C-alpha cells in the first residue's frame, strides 16, 4: 500500500468515526486545513520536477476531493441524526390535556352576556333584532318621538350635540334606542315585533350612571296590540331573565312623550343582607318604563293610528346586569380592569340564560 493509500484509509476512517459535528470539524482541519496532511502534500508539488508533478498531482488532488466528499456526506448524516434526536426529544403526546389557552382564560363581558340572554328570551317570543347608528338626527331622536321644542331632554346638560352636517341637519349622540323604532316603523309594514339593543349617551356620571350606557327597547305594532299583551310579555321576560317561576309586577302611571298611556314597572323583590332576590318578598324595585305608542309617533312614521296601534318598553341593560349578578357599581363596567372582568365575566361557552323558558 502506498503512502497516499494509507493516508486516505486513515483519514476516511476518522471521518466515518467522527461522532458529532465538532469532531468532524477537527478531522477536516487535520486533513484539509492550512497545515493539514493533504494540504502539506499539495505544497510539495511546487518542488517536484514536471514529470513527478504530472504523476503525483492527480493522485494528491484526487485524495483531497475524496476526503472532502466524505466529510460532506458525514456532515449530512450527522445533521439528519441530530434532527431525528431533536424531534424525538420534542415529541408531542397528543393524548395529553392541552394547556390552558386564551379561550379559557378570556372572559365575555357581562354586558355582552346579558344582551345575549335578552335576545334569547325575546327571540323565543318571536321578536327580531333591529339596530341603528349611534349618531342620530334631532328629528329622529326627538321630534319624531313627540318631544316638543323646549323639552328638558333637548338641553345641552342631558344630550351630547355634535356639529351640524353639511346640509345643516342637527346631529347628536342618541339618548335612547327609540330612533331605531322610528326607522323600523318607516321601513316595515305592520305587524312589527322587534327589540332594539345598543349604546346610548347622556351627560351623567355617578355610581349608577355613566355617559355611555346600554339600553334595549321593544316595539310591537299591530291592529290589536294592547296593554294585556304588553303585561304578558314583560312578565314572561322577567321570569325567564331572573330565573324565577313567578313574579309579581306593579304598573304605576307615568309620563313619556312617546307613549300614552305610560307606566313605570316595579318588580317584586326582597332585600335581605344587602342582597336583592326577585319573585319573593314584599318590596318593589323599578326596572323599566313602557306604554302604548303615542298616536303622534305613529303619524310621524307614516302609520294611521286609526288602523294600527302598538306598545313599547325600554330598560337599561347595565342596570339589570347589576341587579341579576350582584354588581354594586356601574363604573367598573367600562374601566377594562382584568381582575374585575375575571371575577364577573363569563366563559366563552357559557350558554345565555333561558332557564325558565316561557310558560305560554
From Swiss-Prot:
A GO-annotated cellular component: cytoplasm
UniProt keyword list: Aminoacyl-tRNA synthetase, ATP-binding, Cytoplasm, Ligase, Magnesium, Metal-binding, Nucleotide-binding, Protein biosynthesis
Entry note: cofactor: Binds 2 magnesium ions per tetramer.
Gene3D superfamilies for the chain: Bira Bifunctional Protein, Domain 2
UniProt-annotated location(s): Cytoplasm
Record's subunit section: Tetramer of two alpha and two beta subunits.
Binding site residues for Mg(2+): 260
GO BP: phenylalanyl-tRNA aminoacylation
Alphabetized Pfam families for the sequence: Phe_tRNA-synt_N, tRNA-synt_2d
Family under the similarity heading: Belongs to the class-II aminoacyl-tRNA synthetase family. Phe-tRNA synthetase alpha subunit type 1 subfamily.
Protein name, entry field: Phenylalanine--tRNA ligase alpha subunit
Organism: Methylobacterium nodulans (strain LMG 21967 / CNCM I-2342 / ORS 2060)
Amino acid at each position: 500500500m502506498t503512502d497516499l493509500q494509507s493516508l486516505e484509509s486513515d483519514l476516511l476512517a476518522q471521518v466515518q468515526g467522527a461522532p458529532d459535528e465538532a469532531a468532524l470539524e477537527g478531522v477536516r482541519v487535520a486533513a484539509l486545513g492550512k497545515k493539514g496532511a493533504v494540504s502539506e502534500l499539495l505544497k510539495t508539488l511546487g518542488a517536484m520536477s514536471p514529470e513527478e508533478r504530472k504523476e503525483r498531482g492527480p493522485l494528491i488532488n484526487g485524495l483531497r476531493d475524496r476526503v472532502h466528499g466524505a466529510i460532506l456526506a458525514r456532515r449530512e448524516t450527522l445533521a439528519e441524526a441530530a434532527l431525528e434526536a431533536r424531534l424525538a426529544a420534542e415529541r408531542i403526546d397528543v393524548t395529553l390535556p392541552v394547556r390552558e389557552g386564551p379561550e379559557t382564560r378570556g372572559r365575555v363581558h357581562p354586558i355582552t352576556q346579558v344582551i345575549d340572554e335578552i335576545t334569547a328570551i325575546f327571540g323565543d317570543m318571536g321578536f327580531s333584532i333591529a339596530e341603528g347608528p349611534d349618531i342620530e338626527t334631532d328629528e329622529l331622536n326627538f321630534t319624531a318621538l313627540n318631544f316638543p321644542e323646549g323639552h328638558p331632554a333637548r338641553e345641552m346638560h342631558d344630550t351630547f350635540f355634535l356639529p351640524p352636517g353639511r346640509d345643516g341637519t342637527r346631529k347628536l349622540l342618541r339618548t335612547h334606542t327609540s330612533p331605531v323604532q322610528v326607522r323600523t316603523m318607516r321601513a316595515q309594514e305592520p305587524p312589527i315585533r322587534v327589540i332594539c339593543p345598543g349604546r346610548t349617551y347622556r351627560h351623567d356620571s355617578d355610581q349608577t350612571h355613566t355617559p355611555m350606557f346600554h339600553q334595549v327597547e321593544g316595539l310591537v305594532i299591530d291592529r290589536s296590540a294592547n296593554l294585556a299583551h304588553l303585561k304578558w310579555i314583560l312578565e314572561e321576560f322577567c321570569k325567564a331573565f331572573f330565573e324565577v317561576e313567578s313574579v309579581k309586577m306593579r304598573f304605576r302611571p307615568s309620563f313619556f312623550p312617546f307613549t300614552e298611556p305610560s307606566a313605570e314597572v316595579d318588580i317584586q323583590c326582597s332585600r335581605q343582607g344587602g342582597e336583592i332576590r326577585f319573585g319573593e318578598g314584599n318590596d318593589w324595585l323599578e326596572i323599566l318604563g313602557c306604554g302604548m305608542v303615542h298616536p303622534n309617533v305613529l303619524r310621524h312614521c307614516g302609520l294611521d293610528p286609526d288602523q294600527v296601534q302598538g306598545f313599547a318598553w325600554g330598560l337599561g341593560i347595565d342596570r339589570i346586569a347589576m341587579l341579576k349578578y350582584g354588581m354594586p357599581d356601574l363604573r367598573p363596567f367600562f374601566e377594562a380592569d382584568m381582575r374585575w372582568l375575571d371575577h364577573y365575566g363569563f366563559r366563552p361557552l357559557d350558554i345565555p340564560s333561558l332557564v325558565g323558558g316561557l310558560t305560554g
